């Protein structure tokens, strides 16, 4: 279940990358990413303070856009042969004499999205940094920071 919808994406986050048709896919995937980052806290303790809930929704929107652009980079970086024998993908160079077209393997593009498209570690780092921008010091409904990954200090303290 996505933690936000296209209406919020357009009017609360003011996003313009996703369309109404594509937004359910990317908002749902972004919500899944946030569930992993927050250790599932959002599923049982979604913030009840409105300002905190808005931050979660904005995080979902920002992550959804990042996932969308990563997907665009993945598609663009791979030259694919179509059924008619033609190739589609990112063009690296074109020569006119004897007609030569070279397709990029994606390494020429140095954007964070291109890096994330070719590396799971880079994608995890990008999504994590986006989440941290929005969720730092935001508590869940039980008062636990959404990004808190530690144990119970009182339970482990020595006397």
Residue ranges and their predicted role:
Residues 1-159:
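Divalent metal-cofactor coordination and adjacent catalytic microenvironments
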């Amino acid at each position: 279940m996505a933690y936000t919808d296209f209406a919020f994406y357009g009017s609360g986050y003011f996003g313009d990358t996703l369309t109404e048709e594509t937004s359910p896919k990317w908002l749902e995937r972004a919500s899944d990413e946030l569930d992993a980052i927050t250790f599932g806290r959002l599923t049982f303790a979604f913030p009840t303070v409105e300002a905190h809930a808005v931050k979660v929704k904005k995080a979902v929107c920002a992550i959804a856009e990042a996932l969308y652009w990563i997907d665009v980079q993945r598609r663009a970086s791979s030259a694919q042969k179509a059924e008619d024998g033609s190739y589609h993908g990112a063009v690296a160079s074109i020569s006119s004499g004897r007609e030569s077209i070279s397709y990029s393997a994606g390494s020429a593009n140095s954007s964070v999205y291109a890096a994330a498209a070719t590396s799971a570690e880079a994608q995890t780092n990008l999504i994590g940094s986006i989440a941290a921008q929005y969720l730092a010091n935001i508590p869940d409904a039980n008062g636990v920071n959404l990004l808190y990954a530690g144990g119970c200090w009182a339970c482990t303290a020595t006397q």
